[in-house]
Structure formats: structure tokens, C-alpha cells
Amino acid sequence: GSYEFAMKSRGKKGGAILGTIPLLGSLGIAIGYAIIVGWVLRSAFGALTGSLMSTEPEQFFTEMSSTNFSSVPWHTLVILLTAAVLIFGVSGGIEKINKVMMPAFFILFIIIAIRVAFLPNAIEGYKYLLVPQWEYLFNPRTWIMAMGQAFFSLSITGSGMIIYGSYLPRNEDVVHSSCMTAVLDTCAAMLAGFAILPSVFAFGLDPASGPKLLFITLPRVFQQMPFGRLFAFFFFISVLFAGITSLANMLEAVSEAAQTRLKLSRKAAVLLSCGAALAVGLFIERDTLMGTLMDVITIYVVPIGAILGAVMAYWVLGINKMEQELMNGRSKPLSRAFAPLAKYVYIFLAALVVFFSFIIPGGIG
């Protein structure tokens, strides 16, 4: 209802229709994301039973991702866990667990990063990650793709963060929280790069292979580590909790819209949203189909949702109203640069991403 609220503040209609675009983006990402989190759950179970450690990682990944309906139980269980989080309000419990799991996740990645540093040919991974190719800085596509990645990584989809923002206490310093989110997200991405890319080159894999790198390279590292089975289990469990939390964010936006627009109860709205995600996801469990869906959503739908959200906030609702809201919980005034950056620079850059999404072959992904 946030888009509708913004439009009504100007005496206009159509907010509900515009709001469906970012909601479709959230639902589309959730459909693909649930499949990947199902693979994470399967890998955690494999680490627990030992099958992950005794099987070739390529074979293990192929068995759970190469055909339709190849990971139905794990995929379904992930959706059920997410529905439980949303229906029974156990998000507080998940948040408490994540306060332990997220630091553990970082610690495990540091341990993995140290281990892979001693693998043969790991130096090529560090070169790939750290040696700059300056010519790409002058290629507009580099910047467009980087911003498109930021939309996805920081959930700037025009829906999920708006819904979660409505649940924050009034005295929350949103600016500080946003900055910390961006910093920690970047740190996590860099740490993952130091853990994964050297092992990619050590094992002769393609660094552009996508999500499968998580399920092939790291199990190979765990297989060569002392107590690797234990490390593998805790690693994938940490990723599982992070995945469930992110999935709940995406489906919360869809559920809230269903609850408001269709006049459903909270439980019915969650079941409808989760059921829709599962119903579609079951038919695209093969990694190539799932990848195609995620490409379409992240290349075309998410950037449009991002610019719609910004236009609604900074132009329709108004920059003055946004500044008033952002000052709640802050002791320092906002920078004078905030208004021009938000109204002009950010929206211009977001519009460029949308434009190039359609004219660059393959989009921005």
C-alpha cells in the first residue's frame, strides 16, 4: 500500500497498479532463491550424513540440480520453514539465532580463506580478484552492471525494504543502518571472493559459473580440511539461516500486499504467497531454468522496481517528507547533498540501469 499512499498524497490513483511491478520482482527472486536455499539445505544434510564428503562435488550438485523435480523435498521444506517464520512470528527467534550464525558465517569464511590460500594455483584467483584492468573503468557497462548488482545484493527492489522499513521503531537511525548494511554486505562479498575464487582456479573451474561455485568449490575445500565434515555442516547451516531470513523478506512483501489488496488473513496471505512460489519453483528446479528466471527478474524487473520506489519516495511523496522521516532517531542533520543525490543523481543512475537493461545484449546481468 506504500505506492498507493504516495499517489493519494497527491490526489492521484494508480499506486496499486504501479506497486505490482516491484512485487513481481520480489516474488520472482523468491521463486529462484527458494530453489538455491533448498540446495543449501540438501548440502547441509549431506555434510551431516557424510555423503557430501564422500561424493564428487560435481556429481552431488548434478544430482540435486540437473533435472526438474530433482530437489522437491528440500525445496518444499525451505518454503515450509519460511512460511512458519512468517505465520508464527518466529522471526524473532531466527534473528536471535542469526546473531550467532552470522558471526560464525564470517569466521568460517575466514578459516576457508586461509585454507584455500595454500592450494596450488590459488594465486591466479587472487590476481583475478585484485589485479585491476583499468580499461574497464572507462566502459559504461562496468558501472551499469555494478549498480545492477547493488540493486540485487542490497534488496533495492522497490518493495521488500519498504515493507521491512515500516516495521522499524520510530527512533531507528535509518541512515546509519543503511550505511552499515552496505558496508557489511561489501565485506561479506569480498570475504566470499577470497574464499571461493582462489579455489575456483585451484580446481580448474570457470569463475563465471554462478551459484554452483558455492556447491562445488567449497565442498572440495572441506574434503581437504581437518574436521572438514564439521566445518561443512556449520557453514551450510549458517548459509541456510541467512537464506531463510532473506527469503522471508521477499515473501513478506508479497504476503503483505495479498493481505491488504485481497483482504486475506495473515495466515491465508502467507500460504498463498509461499504456495505460489513453490508451485512455480517446482517446475524450474533445473539449474539452467532457474538461472534464466533469475536473469530475467534481476536484469529487467528489479531495476524498474528500484526506480519506481525512488520516484514514489522522493518525487511523489516528496523529499521534505522523506527527510522528516529520516531525521527520526538521528542526532545529526542530514547532509545538504542528500536531497540532490536522492532526487537527481540516484534516479538518473537508476534510469540508466533500466535503459541499458533493454539495449545491452544479455542485459546487465
Regions from the PLM with identified roles:
Residues 95, 102-244:
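Membrane-embedded translocation segments of transport machinery
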Residues 75-93, 155-170, 241-254, 311-317, ...:
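Transmembrane alpha-helical segments in integral membrane proteins
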Residues 21-32, 77-84, 97, 144-155, ...:
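Hydrophobic alpha-helical transmembrane segments of multi-pass membrane proteins
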Residues 68-73, 184-190, 229-233, 241-244, ...:
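Loop-to-transmembrane helix boundary motifs in multi-pass membrane proteins
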Residues 2-24, 34-92, 121-144, 208-215, ...:
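Inter-helical loop and helix-membrane interface segments of multi-pass membrane transporters/permeases
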Residues 37, 241-250, 270-280, 298-325, ...:
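Hydrophobic alpha-helical segments of multi-pass membrane transport proteins
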Residues 4, 37-66, 167-171, 176, ...:
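Helix-loop-helix connectors at the membrane interface of multi-pass transporters/channels
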Residues 284-313, 333-365:
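A generic transmembrane alpha-helix motif of multi-pass inner-membrane proteins
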